[in-house]
Structures are given as structure tokens and as C-alpha cells.
């Protein structure tokens, strides 16, 4: 599958074309994801010859053993989560850009460059793989599936009272 590079640097390929509605900025959506560690990462569990992780799946909402399995809820355009407490709905710019071009039922492959992910700072211990924080300058490779767009009134009513979805360990 060939990824096309967008002007922003996001690499994008359609796996399944969706047939449902298309979300807009500030919409709350439910999505599945599978995330692979991208370039810019080193640790004790990597390809020593190339000094990078290669095709290492580190998080998936399809994983039945993951306590947070099932589709996750994000608000397109919400602040990038970088602190110790993830607030329900937070997203990253690369996901937002892709979601705005998708339709419900669609699935895409992405290669999100660092400036559209967690950038120069990286992210807190919440966003981890094998107990390490998401490091600075890390790209993210993922597949995402747009499951549902939540009705506008429903998410506007829910989010102010939602509080933290879960905290870093």
C-alpha cells in the first residue's frame, strides 16, 4: 500500500473507503486504532542493526487484553494530551487531519510525523510503550477506523462534566 504525502507532511492511505457521514472540526468521534512505534525511538527492545523499532505494535483498541479496548472518543481539534492526566477527548494534529477527510466506516493507514504528533517535547508517562514515555521527535504509524460521529448536543452536554478518563500510572 502506497502512502501519499500531504502538504502538512502527514502520510495517508485509504484501506477501506467509508460510506457514512464525514466529521467536522470540534465533532466528537469514536475511532479504533492500532499504533506502531515510528522513527526516533530507541530502547532495550529494538532492531539493534538499525537502532530503531521495526513494526512493533504497541497499542490497539482491538486488543481484548487492553483494559481500554473498544473505540475511543476524541474531539477533533482538542488539545494534544501531553500531561500526566489524559482528559477524555484529547487528540493529536495528525489524527485530526486524517479524521476530517474520512467518512464513518472508513479505515486509513497513517505515518504521522513528529510535528503532527507529540513534537519536540514528547509526551508524559501516560503515553507509553513498555513503560517509557513517548520520546521527543517520534513519528507514529497507525491505522485508524472511524466508527461513529456522536451527535453534537450529546457531546456538548457530556464533556464539561467528564473529568479525567484515567490517570497515568
Where are these regions (language model features)?
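Cross-family detector of peptidyl-prolyl cis-trans isomerase
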Residues: 1-169
Amino acid at each position: 500500500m502506497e502512502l501519499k504525502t500531504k502538504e502538512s507532511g502527514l502520510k495517508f492511505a485509504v484501506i477501506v473507503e467509508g460510506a457514512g457521514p464525514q466529521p467536522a472540526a470540534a465533532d466528537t468521534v469514536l475511532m479504533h486504532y492500532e499504533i506502531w512505534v515510528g522513527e526516533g525511538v530507541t530502547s532495550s527492545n529494538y532492531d539493534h542493526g538499525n537502532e530503531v523499532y521495526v513494526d512493533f505494535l504497541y497499542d490497539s483498541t482491538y486488543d481484548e487484553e487492553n483494559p481500554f479496548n473498544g473505540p475511543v472518543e476524541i474531539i477533533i481539534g482538542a488539545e494534544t494530551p501531553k500531561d500526566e492526566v489524559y482528559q477524555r477527548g484529547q487528540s493529536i494534529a495528525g489524527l485530526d487531519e486524517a479524521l476530517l477527510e474520512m467518512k464513518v466506516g472508513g479505515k486509513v493507514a497513517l505515518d504521522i510525523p513528529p510535528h503532527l504528533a507529540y513534537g519536540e517535547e514528547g509526551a508524559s508517562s501516560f503515553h507509553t510503550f513498555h513503560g517509557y514515555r513517548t520520546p521527543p521527535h517520534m513519528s507514529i504509524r497507525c491505522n485508524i477506523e472511524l466508527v461513529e460521529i456522536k451527535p453534537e448536543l450529546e457531546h456538548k452536554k457530556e464533556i464539561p462534566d467528564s473529568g479525567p478518563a484515567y490517570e497515568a500510572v
